[in-house]
């Protein structure tokens, strides 16, 4: 064997060593990641725990079982039709045990944003949700538009007023509490606020500021003050895009339930960590993998 041939063979062998060493390292890293304990569960509400005033199958008992594990529980929701207190009362009325501090909603995040930015918005939100926001300053012109789920407010004159506020000054903000395409009611799917947000964007030539899911900050802020990394958390939800894809993009595990607004033709990319029939089965999976 010549010196040149020997040197070439050495390089090939060295490449193989590096290849298999890296392959083993990556594999070990993946296994370690999968075996990391679940320390927190972020749970969607509408469509996951309940549909209107009806809990999903065995959801009330499943939540009790999950609490017994000691896992941190936060309810992360884009629900914007009602104030946090009204939402809390309604959930308790249908059997769920939870505290107001456990609800992390896009509505409350939007309230904090309005306060922080010292805005004087025109609100396209329900009358009940409006009570969470600070009062308008009648001495100042409106300088922004806040949009939530407000079926009774989405009529032409209101939308036209919002359009003109945005059009009057390029610095006026369009704040989308969330951009849901649709949500689940007892009588089927219904339009969410997303189409109205996009309509205002198109007509006024502006881009909205998204507050709720799937905003990365919204998921991370649910864990504020907790010594828990996103890799130790699961997100349970019915919305393929906002719940599952949004959470997994941040680094959480995603448990897709087939209740609520779930549609089999809407596929998550990347796929969810696991897909189950309902919230109760999601809890079973967590108990098996804790």
Segments (PLM) and residue ranges:
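Asp-based, Mg2+/Mn2+-dependent phosphohydrolase catalytic module
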Residues: 33-43, 50-69, 82-104, 108-290
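Non-catalytic pre-domain segments flanking phosphatase-related domains
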Residues: 2-7, 13-43
């Amino acid at each position: 064997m010549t010196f040149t041939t020997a040197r070439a063979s050495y390089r090939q062998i060295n490449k193989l060593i590096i290849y298999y060493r890296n392959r083993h390292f990556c594999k070990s890293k993946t296994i370690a990641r999968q075996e990391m304990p679940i320390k927190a569960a972020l749970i969607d509400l509408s469509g996951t725990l309940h549909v209107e005033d009806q809990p999903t199958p065995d959801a009330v008992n499943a939540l009790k079982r999950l609490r017994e594990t000691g896992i941190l529980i936060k309810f992360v929701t884009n629900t914007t039709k009602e104030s946090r207190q009204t939402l809390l009362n309604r959930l308790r009325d249908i059997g769920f045990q939870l505290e107001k501090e456990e609800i992390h909603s896009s509505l409350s995040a939007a309230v904090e944003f309005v306060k922080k930015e010292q805005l004087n918005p025109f609100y396209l939100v329900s009358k009940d949700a409006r009570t969470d926001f600070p009062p308008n300053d009648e001495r100042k012109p409106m300088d922004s538009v806040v949009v939530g789920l407000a079926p009774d407010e989405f009529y032409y004159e209101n939308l036209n007023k919002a359009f003109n506020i945005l059009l009057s000054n390029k610095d006026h903000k369009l704040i989308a509490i969330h951009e849901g395409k649709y949500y689940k009611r007892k009588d089927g799917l219904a339009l969410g606020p997303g189409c109205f947000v996009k309509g205002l964007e198109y007509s006024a030539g502006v881009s909205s500021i998204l507050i709720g899911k799937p905003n990365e900050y919204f998921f991370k802020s649910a864990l504020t003050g907790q010594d828990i990394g996103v890799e130790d958390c699961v997100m349970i939800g019915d919305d393929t895009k906002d719940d599952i894809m949004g959470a997994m993009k941040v680094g959480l595990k995603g448990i897709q339930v087939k209740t609520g607004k779930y549609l089999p033709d809407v596929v998550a990319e990347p796929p969810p960590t696991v897909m189950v029939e309902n919230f109760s089965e999601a809890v079973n999976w967590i108990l098996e993998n804790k």
